[in-house]
Amino acid sequence: MSSRTLYDKVWNFHQVKELPGGSTQLFIGLHLIHEVTSPQAFSALNEKKLGVKFPNLTVATVDHIVPTSNQQRPFSDPLAEEMLSTLEKNCKTHGIKFHGIGSNSQGVVHVMAPELGLTQPGMTVACGDSHTSTHGAFGAIAFGIGTSQVRDVLASQSLAMNKLKVRRIWVEGELQKGVYAKDLILHIIRHLGVKGGVGFAYEFAGPAIEKLSMEGRMTICNMAIEGGARCGYINPDETTFKYLKGKEHAPKGQEWDKAISWWKSLASDSKATFDDEIQLDGSSIEPTVTWGITPGQGISIKETIPNPEFLPKNEQQIAKDACKYMNLKPDEPIEGQSIDVCFIGSCTNGRLSDLQEASKIVKGNTVADGIRAFVVPGSQKVAKEAKEKGLDKIFLKAGFEWREPGCSMCLAMNPDKLEGRQISASSSNRNFKGRQGSAKGRTLLMSPAMVAAAAINGRVTDVRKFLQE
């Protein structure tokens, strides 16, 4: 019993029973829902005349389809209004807490749930959204699920799951100035590949990980799925406990002391056995930018676009496709590439610290001519705290647009979209073809501070140049 990983401990704690065929019925401690993947699930419940098993363990918000420039109801998009109205109705019918438009707690689901203290160490967390792995930053086992599984959790508060292998990614050293959690996770995905984590849960550990804030840790775990891992997690520690203390849904009084005791016991044992282990040097990582059409196609700011001919054979064709789609030439530098749009936000990088780091670059500068730049806080709470610190004024004075919370241009299921062949510098998580709303639109993923630097110069820029001034 002294050689278990956190994944083993949390899995065993939530295991209901073994199922025929080798899968496990796993109890889900927190179920998060939003307007996109829940309607069909509720319809299925209604057809079978089933209710929601534990309404108090499901929490809802609206984020994907909400406009960020004008959130007055009814929305101008009738489909978006219908999706929101449907979620409101379903939550009311089944007694589910809904953080909707007009609520001071509405926001992107993977931003608002942690800041309310809903996500806690040792939980199993499920949501009909790919980036549910975000919540692993707290020492939870969190994973995205499909609509049919959303139905199953609503009906039974459990899922049939197959246990994953665990790979520990140990990051030595400390990130240098101008290098952020986003750079680290892009670096990891680059080296392990977008399919490298298939069949694995990733445990992120080591000095460089331990030095990250909770918001940085959420960025890391958020993109574990982009490396193929179903979930990613970080062992809870004093940083975790300090973040949670006093949060609305965090334990209070004696219950807090009991929780701390249990949470401390969850960390992977010193003699835990992992299915695979990787070690990286965090101090050698530089600001990182994607150049292609997968999050794994990233390079440091000082590198050139890879020549497909010199890549492994299994990577050559997608690299050729990426160069053609992105209109980039092999061996040309990524630094200096022109951009059209700059987007700071998303469940990856729409938190207060992300906006603070970006504002340091923006302050006293002006957005370059012809560049459209906007900031979308990840939640109403983030927006409120940012305004209290005057961040909105810094961005507005520089020529950025300041928007209302929502998923925005991360996936463009709302009015925020690229047009034509526009290319964006984006703090989001995916750079797939057409991801940001235009079938021909192009995306360069980078940290919020790097996006800010790109907005000021009108092209991809090493943010460290601003930090030296």
Curated annotation (Swiss-Prot):
Its cofactor is [4Fe-4S] cluster. Keywords: 4Fe-4S, Amino-acid biosynthesis, Branched-chain amino acid biosynthesis, Iron, Iron-sulfur, Leucine biosynthesis, Lyase, Metal-binding. [4Fe-4S] cluster binds at residues 347, 407, 410. Its EC number is 4.2.1.33. It is an enzyme of class 4 (lyase). It catalyses: (2R,3S)-3-isopropylmalate = (2S)-2-isopropylmalate. The keyword Signal does not apply. Pathway: Amino-acid biosynthesis; L-leucine biosynthesis; L-leucine from 3-methyl-2-oxobutanoate: step 2/4. Gene3D superfamilies: Aconitase, domain 3 (3.30.499.10). Heterodimer of LeuC and LeuD. Catalyzes the isomerization between 2-isopropylmalate and 3-isopropylmalate, via the formation of 2-isopropylmaleate. Belongs to the aconitase/IPM isomerase family. LeuC type 1 subfamily. This is 3-isopropylmalate dehydratase large subunit.
